Curated annotation (Swiss-Prot):
Protein name stated in the entry: tRNA(Met) cytidine acetate ligase
Location of this chain's protein in the cell: Cytoplasm
Recorded superkingdom: Bacteria
Family that this chain belongs to: Belongs to the TmcAL family.
Organism: Mesomycoplasma hyopneumoniae (strain J / ATCC 25934 / NCTC 10110) (Mycoplasma hyopneumoniae)
Gene Ontology BP annotations: tRNA modification
Gene name per UniProt: tmcAL
Amino acid sequence: MAIAIIAEYNPFHNGHIYQLEYTKKNFPNDKIYIILSGNFTQRGEISLADFKTKSKIALKYGADFIIKLPFEYATQAAHIFAKGAIKIVNQHKIDKIIFGSESNDVENLYKLANLWNQNQEAYNAFLKYALKLGYSFPKASAFALEEISGQKIVFPNDILGFEYIKQIVANNYPIRAYTLKRSEEFSLKNPEPNIASATYLRQLVNENKSISRFSPMKFIHPVCSLANLYPEFQKIVRETSPENLAKIWLISEGIENLFKKHINEPNFEKFLNAVNSRRYTNSRIKRAMVYILFRIEDPSQFDEEKIQLDCWKNQGF
């Protein structure tokens, strides 16, 4: 018997420690597997800590086994991220997963996943319609689900959890999902006494502020950041033709021309703001930037272990 947690640990923090302790307490007969992203994340960010460090700290705080989520899944949109992660869970004959959820209503997520599975033709028609209107894929997916179910999934952990359960239902995997209540107050503006979101902690780290109240991890500047690689990204985009940019994975729908148009923006944040639109979310843009920076045409053939950034030396626990 085993239970899986699908994680990025960017960075590992007290909320993750609580999840491991909760899982060990409530599933005492199960080995805990972490399906863990490597050095890059689903939102297109460079992980603050490398895979090896994240693995060590997870094992220290209660995980039994670490399985790496391949780059080709770890740096994709939520539905592809979930597809890869749940496929790995099934391959390793792990019969349970547990994830944080704002609603903590796993039965409703199953209900919606079954409704989606039984109405894929209608769902796909609504999805296609929304994409034609210029919606981003996440917004189009939410629109299509609401059209067939009358419900919106609005919280980020519920959205990702729904994607996990969709994969379980669609593939009839012998896996049962469980949830751990995660407060919607668990945010940038409302950190709890000793627990804060990874987003908030990344902000503190980037501002060179201590996160010791919220995490056992320590970081020294300069830390890993896509913003620090923006000059290199500018150089590549300026020197590469649109035709050759379009050969890179995720560079489609003319996004290469949009990048060319705004490549003289003076910094990463201004570039993001210039390129961001209803169709292209920040995460979609950042994922594309990662693929351009490392000239990745086929993510299944990309060995991220060959990328060694000095900033990964500036972290530990």
